[in-house]
Design a protein with these regions (language model features):
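Conserved, single-site charged/polar hotspot
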Residues: 1-270
Length: 270
């Protein structure tokens, strides 16, 4: 069975510089292209090779072809925001947006996940961690695609709030993207190209978990995850934690292996 295709929004800029590694086909003209390319946003149009477009679609001529985007902003609005060049597989198109040219990568889900699990954490992480990450990320992604398909067919909006007598749950930014499925930055999932997937284990992980998702009955779980670079976990009931745990000296987590191993528990994902 073929994997579903996902449309990933990579960047929006007034000028987009990119390089074709291998041949790509400009579907409107049928021309085969390779090497350095550049497109500009002028008066609501895309200027490319001396012509005006509202949308341009490029298809790889070979599965081995890839394209490189120059100066992609990652970590947008975070303290570590920076720009870097990134390489991608699959097709891509340039679309006019309100603020510039929107670059969208069209790629199959499994190829997308190869980059995600290498970009969110590290391609050098343990195999079992990467397998769990692949299942969670695949579930979240397919839940978004399913939602977009459903909303595209019906006059309805995604439920953003759930309330009962005990709690109020609110989701933010669920309908931020209307011309692609997900974006490539922390707002959705980090998708930073094929260069980070350098460890052969990443390919093994995607192959071994291919098609595996989390479901609740007949519904794909909107399996959101969070991560941080430090701190100590705690039950969700306490609204905050004091600076130090009263009456305890606390554990020493200064070293890479200094955390105490807790009691074994059954796996939540298998």
């Amino acid at each position: 069975m073929e994997a579903p295709v996902v449309n990933v929004g990579i960047m929006t800029e007034k000028a987009v510089s990119f390089v074709f590694h291998g041949e790509y086909v400009h579907t409107e003209t049928g021309k085969f292209l390779t090497g350095e390319q550049r497109a500009l946003f002028v008066n609501g149009n895309i200027v490319y090779n001396g012509r005006l477009f509202k949308e341009i679609f490029f298809e790889p001529a070979s599965p081995s072809s890839s394209f490189e985007l120059k100066a992609v902003t990652i970590g947008r609005n975070f303290h570590w925001q920076r720009q870097e060049d990134q390489c991608f597989k699959g097709a891509f198109n340039l679309v006019t947006g309100e603020n510039g040219i929107v670059v969208i990568n069209q790629v199959d889900v499994e190829e997308y996940l190869t980059s995600v699990i290498s970009s969110e954490m590290s391609a050098q992480a343990s195999k079992e961690l990467l397998k769990a990450h692949a299942v969670i990320s695949r579930s979240w992604l397919l839940a978004q695609i399913e939602k977009n398909f459903r909303l595209g067919r019906k006059e309805e909006k995604q439920q953003n709030c759930y309330r009962d007598n005990e709690q109020l749950i609110r989701w933010y930014d669920r309908e931020d993207h209307n011309i692609f499925d997900v974006c490539a930055d922390d707002h959705c999932q980090r998708y930073q190209g094929i260069t980070r997937a350098s460890n052969p284990i990443v390919q093994e992980v995607i192959h071994e978990t291919r098609g595996e998702i989390l479901v609740n009955g007949e519904t794909i779980c909107d399996a959101r995850f969070s991560k941080c670079c430090g701190g100590v976990t705690e039950q969700f009931e306490p609204p905050f934690l004091p600076d130090s745990i009263e009456g305890q000296s606390g554990n020493n987590f200064s070293g890479p292996h200094s955390g105490r191993r807790g009691p074994e528990m059954d796996s939540l994902c298998s």
